[in-house]
């Protein structure tokens, strides 16, 4: 006889699997067919009749038998209902198959709303995309003493073409980073790619018997569930009293529409139960990418499986020269990069969209205005991937980037990132700016794949004495939002830096020195002046 504890676990697993058949397979909400305007309304499928085809033996017997009348009962059409299709609520059906939905039906969820699904003492796995790192990393999730937490880093194929970097080198880098930056000790930081199937075995090995996946919308939780189901299929009894076959549990609903999941969804994967939670938003109640971008552009951004490896291998760049007029670079109007005058820059873009340069931001916004005003698509419509409200400068935030040497990556939360590099002999000529829609967080980082690779090699060569992350300089930083009228951006940045670090004086490096002496000439190691990120 099985121990009582194992019987209880099996009983709970059966209950969790049963939930999948009374809930919407896309969003997880409980289905009902009484109130058409209520949450979870669906139309029950009609029973379909399928005629069984006669087998070849029956046909032969019919052709060559002398007693045809005796075959009537044997050859009568046998009718049987078809297997039930996955059930889906009207809200998800309209959005997925008819592309009709309202923002109110796909609202954001606060962290408190998501946590109501998680019992105390549960095993939580914080899913954070490497493309957005560290913007979606939430220290409150990892350090919550009520739960056992670990870090899973998704979408690794969009930062490196080398899966061995995720398997062998990334764990040590993130282990040292969490300890150094957040004072958090963990040996369970796994980087993976669900769409490519990279490192899925390692993810499964760190999952506990009953695990909860938590993260922001479209962080890759549901895609991970499907990758796990594919590699570790779980069998369950078929529906019906006479069913004897087994079928694989249906996968998680994956969509390019943000906030598709709105209730807990549990999956029996191998010998473990994985619970997929709705995505939470730290800026709950504030505008997000869906309030600024066109639906088609947002769809391309969310379809991460379409990302091509050749982008990372070839790294094709666009040259951008800064001018006194404020020449800018954009990708479908999602953001506007304004370099300092007389600088030559290379931009390697990893965000889906069409690249274009304008004389200045005012000219770019006038194109947005004219294209939305035109009833028919104009010649520049392909470069406008934002909603009509984004024709106004008031709907943008001016982010000033701290000084940098060499290459950096500019990260836009829930959108993606691009690489920026100044070329030629180094000379400080001013600060770069990135204008983005309100509600979109921005940060910069040294190229993360290079950080992981160089950090791991340094860790190995020192036999573990040297950490896999630089200790003497900051490699991640928030940006500095400023008013449109601010002209002395370097001085304003210093003031904002001092305010941000008033409770972290150890982060105040080079404060007593003249900033122009520090960033005026190239340094052997980038000083990264005014770089600071609040973990």
Swiss-Prot record:
Organelle transit peptide residues: 1-38
GO MF entry, a single one: GTP binding
Keyword Transit peptide: yes
PROSITE patterns (UniProt xref): G_CP
A GO cellular-component term linked to this record: mitochondrion
Subcellular location: Mitochondrion
CP-type G domain: residues covered: 111-283
Keywords for the protein's UniProt record, in alphabetical order: Mitochondrion, Transit peptide
Keyword Transit peptide: yes
Primary subcellular site in the record, as a coarse category: mitochondrion
Gene3D superfamilies: P-loop containing nucleotide triphosphate hydrolases
Family per similarity comment: Belongs to the TRAFAC class YlqF/YawG GTPase family. GEP3 subfamily.
Function: May be involved in the mitochondrial lipid metabolism.
Name of the featured protein: Genetic interactor of prohibitins 3, mitochondrial
Primary gene name: GEP3
């Amino acid at each position: 006889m099985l121990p009582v504890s194992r019987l209880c676990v099996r009983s709970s697993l059966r209950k969790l699997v049963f939930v999948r058949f009374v809930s919407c397979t896309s969003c997880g909400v409980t289905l009902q067919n009484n109130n058409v305007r209520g949450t979870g309304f669906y139309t029950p499928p009609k029973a379909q009749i399928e005629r069984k085809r006669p087998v070849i033996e029956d046909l032969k017997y019919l052709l060559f038998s002398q007693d045809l009348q005796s075959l009537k009962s044997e050859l009568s059409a046998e009718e049987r209902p078809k297997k039930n299709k996955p059930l889906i609520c009207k809200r998800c059906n309209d959005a997925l198959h008819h592309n009709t939905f309202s923002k109110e039906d796909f609202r954001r969820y606060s962290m408190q709303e998501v946590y109501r699904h998680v019992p105390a003492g549960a095993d939580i796995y914080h899913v954070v995309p490497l493309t957005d790192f560290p913007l979606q990393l939430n220290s409150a999730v990892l350090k919550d003493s009520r739960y056992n937490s670990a870090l899973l880093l998704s979408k690794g194929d969009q930062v490196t073409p080398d899966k061995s970097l995720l398997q062998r080198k990334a764990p040590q880098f993130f282990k040292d980073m969490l300890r150094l930056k957040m004072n958090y000790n963990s040996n369970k930081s796994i980087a993976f790619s669900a769409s490519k199937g990279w490192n899925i075995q390692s993810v499964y090995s760190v999952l506990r018997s009953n695990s909860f996946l938590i993260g922001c919308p479209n962080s890759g939780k549901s895609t991970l569930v499907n990758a796990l189901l594919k590699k570790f299929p779980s069998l369950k009894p078929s529906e019906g009293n006479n069913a004897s076959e087994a079928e694989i549990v249906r996968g998680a609903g994956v969509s390019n529409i943000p906030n598709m999941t709105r209730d807990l969804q549990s999956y029996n994967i191998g010998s473990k139960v994985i619970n997929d939670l709705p995505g939470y938003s730290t800026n709950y109640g504030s505008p997000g990418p869906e309030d600024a971008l066109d639906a088609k552009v947002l769809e391309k951004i969310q379809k991460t499986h379409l990302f091509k490896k050749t982008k990372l291998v070839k790294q094709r760049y666009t040259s951008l020269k800064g001018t006194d007029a404020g020449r800018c670079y954009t990708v479908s109007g999602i953001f506007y990069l304004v370099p300092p005058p007389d600088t030559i820059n290379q931009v390697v873009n990893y965000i889906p969209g069409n690249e274009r340069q304008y004389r200045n931001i005012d000219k770019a916004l006038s194109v947005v205005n004219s294209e939305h005003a035109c009833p028919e698509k104009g010649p520049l419509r392909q470069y406008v991937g934002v909603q009509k409200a984004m024709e106004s400068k008031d709907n943008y935030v001016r982010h000033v980037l701290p000084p940098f040497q060499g290459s950096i990556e500019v990260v836009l939360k829930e959108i993606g990132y691009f690489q920026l590099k100044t070329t030629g002999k180094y000379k400080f000529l001013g600060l770069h700016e990135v204008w983005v829609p309100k509600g979109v967080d921005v940060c910069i980082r040294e190229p993360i794949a290079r950080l992981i690779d160089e950090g791991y090699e340094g860790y190995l060569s020192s036999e573990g004495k040297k950490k896999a992350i630089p200790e003497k300089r900051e490699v991640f930083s928030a940006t500095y939002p400023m008013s449109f009228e601010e002209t002395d951006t370097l001085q304003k940045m210093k003031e904002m830096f001092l305010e941000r670090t008033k409770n972290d004086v150890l982060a105040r490096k080079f404060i007593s020195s003249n900033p122009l002496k520090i960033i005026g000439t190239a340094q052997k190691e980038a000083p990264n002046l005014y770089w600071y990120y609040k973990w």
